[in-house]
């Protein structure tokens, strides 16, 4: 039976980033993703601040970067609206499927193992099933 220091259930962005950081510290990490592919299905709209990505150690590539948003017009149910403009804080639209794959690659390069089409049913005293 294979043994790992850490087993992470779910290959979402948070699971993959956790795997990346834990593996960087020298621990053996296994990520179990029940889906057939990392990044599917898409669970988020993909709007993130450029500074947040930078802080998390993610630099968008040409595949992950879709566009940049400098302003937004938000409508309330009453019909009133507010416009938000930003010269400092940039919000970018990312392709979440590709972003997840980019972070998965970073996790693997840090030493984590990722298994797709693999879930687990329960935690036991001897491990997981």
Predicted region positions:
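Conserved N-terminal helical subregion
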Residues: 74-129
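A secondary-structure boundary/capping signal
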Residues: 9-12, 34, 95, 116
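Short, basic and Ser/Thr-rich N-terminal targeting/leader segments
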Residues: 2, 67-70, 116, 126
């Amino acid at each position: 039976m294979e043994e790992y220091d850490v087993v992470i259930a779910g290959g979402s962005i948070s699971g993959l980033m956790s795997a990346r950081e834990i593996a960087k510290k020298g621990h053996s990490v296994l990520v179990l993703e029940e889906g057939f592919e990392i990044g599917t299905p898409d669970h988020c709209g993909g709007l993130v601040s450029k500074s947040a990505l930078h802080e998390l150690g993610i630099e968008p590539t040409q595949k992950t970067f879709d566009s940049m948003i400098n302003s937004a017009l938000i409508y309330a149910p009453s019909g009133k609206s507010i416009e938000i403009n930003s010269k400092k804080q940039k919000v970018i639209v990312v392709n979440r499927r590709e972003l997840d794959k980019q972070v998965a690659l970073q996790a693997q390069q840090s030493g984590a193992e990722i298994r797709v089409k693999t879930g687990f049913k329960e935690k036991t005293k001897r491990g997981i099933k």
